[in-house]
Amino acid sequence: DGFTLFDNTGGSKGSGGSGSGGIGVNSFLWRASLDTIAFMPLLSADPFGGVIITDWYGPPESQNERFKLNVFILGKTLRSDGVRATVFKQVKDTDGSWVDAARDGELDRDVEDSILTRARELKINSLPQR
């Protein structure tokens, strides 16, 4: 029958409501991560290890910078410390070569916050309606 990547039970079958749904990490955080970075090209996505790696993406409005993301889902529970994002940025120098820009921890936190907000929405939407 294959395996279940996402179930619609909200993780209620013996998983303590963790939303793990047949994968190695919290399925709400996993789905939210994919939703949040859907505009970026994926290089690798491992639902069992909880690792998502994107390729470089250049925003259409800025031809002189590009970004790459690594997202790590750190467990099976939906918690604020359950996701880590690392944003890498490169800019073009005067001869047109890409060079690494200084890291900005605020960008990392912004991506993490977006993922957490989406994960909460997914969890709320999965709860039975009263």
Segments predicted by a language model, with ranges:
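Ser/Thr-rich, low-complexity intrinsically disordered terminal regions
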Residues: 1-130
